[in-house]
Amino acid sequence: KAQGWTTVMMRNVPHSYTCDKLIGLLESKGFSKWFDFVYVPINFTHMLGVGYAFVNLTSQERAEEFILAFDGFEGWDSSFSKEACTMHWSVCQGLDENISRYRNSPLMCEEVPAFYKPVLLKDGVRIEFPKPTKQLRTLRRRKGKQEEGEGEE
């Protein structure tokens, strides 16, 4: 990993999890105010999570501690999954890169409910996502495929 990496990918997140539910879990485990970006990609055909999430921590040191705390985590509040979480560095790194990746995504269209969109926080309090810098395309629903703007693998 490169120095200064702060964004992690959590795998084996239960399909029932949304950003709100994941934020609640992270806060309950003592990580309140440690993160400033959370996104749980959703399959809009089934209206369920796709099994992973992205979290940006406020420093590399916090990211490394977060990885240690959640790698192998099995305490999900869900009947959907009892798989252990595995932690990875995200391809997209840092708050600015995550904002750039999603601010002009079809995911940010008005018709997409807010609870399916990425969340930004400052000192543990939600803040508004920056406005798009260009015209947003409508989110396309494609059979058998994930929706655009869902994340990376």
Report residues per predicted region.
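Alpha-helical solenoid scaffolds in eukaryotic macromolecular assemblies
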Residues: 55, 62, 86-94, 109, ...
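Canonical RRM/RBD RNA-binding surface and closely related RRM-like beta-sheet modules
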Residues: 1-50, 58-83
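Low-complexity, flexible helical/coil segments
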Residues: 46-48, 74-76, 93, 121-127
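Low-complexity RS/RG/RGG-rich segments used by eukaryotic RNA-binding proteins and nuclear co-regulators
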Residues: 74-103
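Alpha-helical structural motif
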Residues: 18, 53, 94-98
